[in-house]
């Protein structure tokens, strides 16, 4: 589902039990808190956490394999420059791998093992190291091609994009 800021604000108001409003009485104040601004801060915090940490099945995934180039470095290594709006890499598969790569952070023990040619990953258990916008692949050869690269992408400003099940992660304020 893809929601605009106004639509997302409406969903949050409903989930926070701030709507539906009673229409049989009117109260007017000018010294109150800007509820919409406060809710928008909570929405943005929730959404950033959602994009970065929530299980992939709750998010919209984009295959960017056709939009990027794989630079083969030899010795079983390659690099890919990720698109600017890529928030998180979820799945990587090369044409000659037996399974998708294990995706790790650059400071993980498995990533550090890739620095040594003797402990480096192979085709049977490839490794992908995500370091900001650079994806380092291990277990590739000169004929390898990127067949799948699924990413969580930052949507256009003013929009929120996710699976409807992600709404269940909204907590009460």
Question: How should these model regions be labeled?
Answer:
Residues 1-126, 130-173:
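Glycine-enriched, solvent-exposed interface loops adjoining structured elements
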